[in-house]
């Protein structure tokens, strides 16, 4: 993957990248037509990161940026990445409005073709789903390789369909944490699975309705110091 092709959104940087036009348009429409921009940290990320000493984090598919903003507010330096230019621009603007712009860099990437440069203490992939063909296993494996020694990769996926979800495909299969770990295909000599669980939680839909939904959670730690770049 080419780390140079993303479009960086800071006060002082610009550039052009390539992206799958359909996927980019889809997610641009998704965020461009979104009036409410309410974004909160995922509790599973907060639970994982709260005990850690703040370092350098990467938020893959940051979307509205609730996770990025929360991490930056805890003292982390965060690179927030999304295929949607609207999403990353809004995260950048929100960070600026909150006075934490110095700890947030936003970059537009189609992660199928480019990946941000750097080494990270924490990589977070929260509900990193897309309806388009996407080499997710390869991207997440690249993320695992971008970890510093002792760094953590937290993947939180949907494990069930909420009644208000835009995707009600009855045949949808949500990969289990074990299946996600198998897709990553990481050498157990160098990466450890710290958590592979499917907890339920009470979720609230856009109209205030509630339902129990499942999250598929995988937490991986890089162990091998000799492999770090
Ligand atoms: C289901 S949303 C989750 C957003 C956010 N992480 C959250 O928890 O609310 C999936 C996110 O992945 C982004 N995404 C989809 N395909 C992508 C790609 N090829 N490269 C980078 N980001 C992508 C979307 O724009 C979207 O923001």
Predicted regions and their residues:
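Short alpha-helix
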Residues: 173-189, 195-196
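Core SAM-dependent methyltransferase catalytic element
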Residues: 204-229
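Class I SAM-dependent methyltransferase SAM/SAH-binding core
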Residues: 68-111
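Conserved class I S-adenosyl-L-methionine
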Residues: 1-52, 55-63, 161
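A short, conserved alpha-helix within the catalytic core of class I
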Residues: 130-143
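A short acidic, Gly/Pro-enriched loop at the edge of an enzyme's catalytic core
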Residues: 115-122
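Conserved beta-strand signature within the Rossmann-like core of class I S-adenosyl-L-methionine
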Residues: 150-158
